[in-house]
């Protein structure tokens, strides 16, 4: 899993190249539209929200907007790790209000692995095995939250069905 430098971040800050390339592909249109709407409706807050790959893109979106002077915050669900520890520390300083929601058993917050020099940014809110919402420690990798779920308990269903009774990626006919 290739990592690349993130524009505007400190020396040594690296991000997952695939997630970053996906953001760069969309950034021009997204940033232009958000800038237009922010100017038109200056009292409204900007929130970049996403699940799974969309969560990784929400992190990039928020960092990009904030570097351009647009106040934004990220709210993510089932987010994969986006960058290394230098990027994560920088991102926390850029977007201190971000919230990352994880669910017990969701496999996606375990990739890319820490062993490949990926780290989460705080703050994690963890839906534990009983469905209770736990505020995790400020490390981004709290062993009593998602990071502590045994590998044998990880599955795809928790990723698509484990968040507030919302089923992601499904369409239903009435």
Predicted features along the sequence, with ranges:
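Active-site signature of alpha/beta-hydrolase-fold catalytic machinery across serine-
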Residues: 60-64
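Generic hydrophobic, helix-prone segments enriched in Leu/Val/Ile
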Residues: 19, 38, 91, 145, ...
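A conserved cap/lid and substrate-binding interface adjacent to the catalytic center
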Residues: 1-49, 66-73, 95-96, 172-174
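The feature captures the conserved acid-bearing segment of alpha/beta-hydrolase catalytic domains
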Residues: 67, 71-152
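C-terminal helix/juxtamembrane-tail motif
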Residues: 142-174
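Generic structural signal of hydrophobic/aromatic residues within well-ordered alpha-helices
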Residues: 26, 30, 34, 87, ...
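Short, flexible coil/linker elements and helix-boundary hinge sites characteristic
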Residues: 5, 16, 41-42, 131, ...
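Gly/Ala-rich beta-loop-alpha elbow adjacent to hydrolase catalytic centers
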Residues: 50-54, 58
């Amino acid at each position: 899993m290739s990592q690349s430098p993130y524009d505007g971040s400190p020396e040594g800050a690296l991000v997952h190249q695939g997630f970053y390339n996906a953001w760069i592909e969309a950034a021009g249109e997204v940033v232009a539209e958000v800038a237009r709407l922010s100017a038109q409706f200056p009292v409204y807050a900007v929130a970049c929200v996403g699940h799974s790959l969309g969560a990784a893109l929400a992190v990039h979106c928020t960092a990009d907007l904030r570097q351009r002077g647009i106040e934004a915050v990220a709210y993510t669900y089932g987010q994969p790790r986006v960058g290394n520890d230098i990027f994560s520390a920088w991102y926390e300083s850029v977007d201190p209000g971000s919230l990352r929601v994880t669910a017990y058993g969701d496999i996606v917050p375990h990739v890319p692995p820490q062993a490949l020099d990926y780290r989460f940014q705080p703050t994690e809110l963890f839906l534990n095995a009983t469905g209770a919402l736990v505020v995790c420690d400020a490390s981004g990798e709290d062993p009593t939250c998602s990071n502590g779920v045994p590998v044998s308990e990880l599955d795809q269903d928790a990723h698509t069905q484990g968040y507030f009774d919302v089923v992601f990626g499904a369409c239903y006919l009435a």
